[in-house]
Amino acid sequence: MVLDTGPLLAALDAADPDHPRCAALLTDAAEDLVVPALVLAELDYWCARRLSADAWLIFLDDVVAGAYRVESPTTIDLSRCRELQDRYRDLSLGLVDASIIALAERLGEPKVATLDQRHFRAVRPAHVAAFELMP
């Protein structure tokens, strides 16, 4: 499953209304939890704004311990991001969301964990008819 920033942030924030279902999704997942490298940067930013440095460091400890698999974008992924951002210009699809889509396509992964229903329901991935959005 490829992870967007929203579920990760909600899982770290006990006050977030989506915390219970996002924390359960990450805790109970049987499959690999894949985090695009650009999501790491966005999560660091939002932890600093909404939570604390401790929240980010706890998450980073989990990454280092192997709870998550981090994937950097390839040149081909970035080319696909450019295609997606051009095609879905009316959605204002950002680079982070485009990189999640490109990575899911590259890995052949149908599941995306996101709280961003708008973008991920509108985009038609190349490898499946539609993403299976979690939670």
Where do the language-model regions lie?
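Active-site neighborhoods of divalent-metal-dependent phosphate/nucleic-acid chemistry enzymes
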Residues: 69-115
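Histidine- and aromatic-rich ligand-binding microenvironments
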Residues: 1-4, 35-36, 93-94, 116, ...
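Acidic, PIN/NYN-like endoribonuclease modules and their adjacent C-terminal/linker elements
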Residues: 101, 105-135
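Short, well-structured N-terminal submotif of metal-dependent ribonuclease cores
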Residues: 1-35, 48-60, 126-128
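Alpha-helix/helix-capping structural signal
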Residues: 6-7, 38, 76, 118
